[in-house]
């Protein structure tokens, strides 16, 4: 999510790109996609994101709601799922549990609300307004007058309790990891941030897991057929096995399909000799899976 040099050369605005598409357009192309031989469609995350360049869905602002920019007055997410099923096709929903965007999250860190009259208003970050009487608004009453860099630090100050701009206590429920590291490959890859706009969620927190499982369970109940998990390597496999996979399989059935991104930026078999963040650690076949076998045949 950057304003690239070629954008500037082409005089492209620093606003919302038109690459997102919507459910209505996808429904109109289902016959074409099926004719190509595809039986399933893997879509980007549908959850509400902040604004502007958050076009791809990977910077959650509210996990529990579908981004209105994908919808039309007459076509919602459920309509896409139903339309695909009517044609014998499946919907694979891309999901994220590792992180949110840096404007907080409606349940984990309620800091902002969106104020807009039309979808065009969502093109600008100016639609993001601090929630009155929130911890964020009380701590930074002059947020709008801060320079962009300090605005970013103010948001992290609340989400990760960085104490960079004030010494108060924030995120007292530990919904986020408070490590300051920013790295894709390091021993803190599962507790630090992978990027400035991806604030690491404390996926080991049972309350966080309960919230995320409720949210994604609702999508399964809508009829989503499978999950593709983004940044899977950045969540401990032990955490996934303990808190997340059992819940999704209980909701979706023993055969509910999940696959994920275990992306490394090295050519080594073992990622920096750390098995816990290496691809094989996430792909070993297990013939004796207690949580799957306990589900029975439903």
Say what each PLM segment does.
Residues 1-90, 105, 192-198:
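N-terminal structural segment of carbohydrate-active enzymes
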Residues 80-88, 98-99, 111, 132, ...:
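Active-site-proximal helices and loops of the catalytic beta/alpha 8
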Residues 52-64, 98-184, 273-280:
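Aromatic- and acidic-residue-enriched segments that line the glycan-binding/catalytic groove
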Residues 1, 42-53, 95-104, 231-236, ...:
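Short, solvent-exposed turn/loop segments enriched in Gly/Ser/Thr/Pro and often Arg
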Residues 19-32, 201-221:
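Short, acidic/polar
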Residues 192-203, 237-245:
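Active-site cleft segment of glycoside hydrolase catalytic domains centered on the general acid/base Glu
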């Amino acid at each position: 999510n950057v304003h690239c040099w070629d954008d500037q050369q082409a005089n492209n605005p620093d606003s919302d790109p038109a690459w997102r598409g919507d459910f209505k357009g996808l429904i109109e192309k289902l016959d074409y996609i099926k004719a190509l031989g595809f039986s399933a469609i893997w879509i980007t995350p549908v959850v509400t994101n902040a604004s502007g360049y958050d076009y791809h869905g990977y910077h959650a602002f509210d996990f529990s709601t579908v981004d209105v920019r994908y919808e039309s007055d007459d076509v919602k997410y459920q309509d896409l799922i139903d339309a695909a099923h009517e044609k014998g096709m499946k919907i694979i929903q891309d999901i994220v549990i590792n992180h949110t965007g840096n404007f907080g999250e409606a349940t984990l860190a309620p800091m902002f609300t969106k104020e807009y009259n039309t979808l065009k208003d969502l093109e600008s970050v100016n639609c993001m307004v601090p929630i009155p009487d929130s911890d964020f608004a009380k701590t930074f009453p002059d947020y709008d007058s801060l320079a962009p860099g300090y605005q970013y630090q103010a948001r992290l100050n609340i989400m990760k309790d960085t104490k960079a701009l004030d010494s108060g206590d924030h995120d007292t429920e530990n919904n986020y990891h408070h490590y300051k590291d920013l790295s894709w490959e390091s021993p803190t890859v599962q507790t630090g941030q992978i990027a400035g706009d991806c604030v690491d969620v404390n996926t080991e927190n049972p309350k966080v897991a309960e919230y995320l499982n409720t949210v994604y369970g609702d999508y399964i109940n809508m009829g989503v057929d499978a999950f593709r998990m983004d940044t899977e390597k950045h969540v401990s496999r032990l955490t996934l096995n303990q808190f997340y996979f059992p819940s999704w399989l209980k909701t979706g059935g023993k055969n509910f399909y999940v696959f994920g991104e275990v992306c490394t930026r090295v050519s080594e078999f073992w990622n920096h000799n750390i098995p816990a963040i290496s691809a094989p650690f996430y792909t070993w076949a297990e013939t004796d899976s207690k949580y799957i076998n306990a589900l029975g045949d439903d």
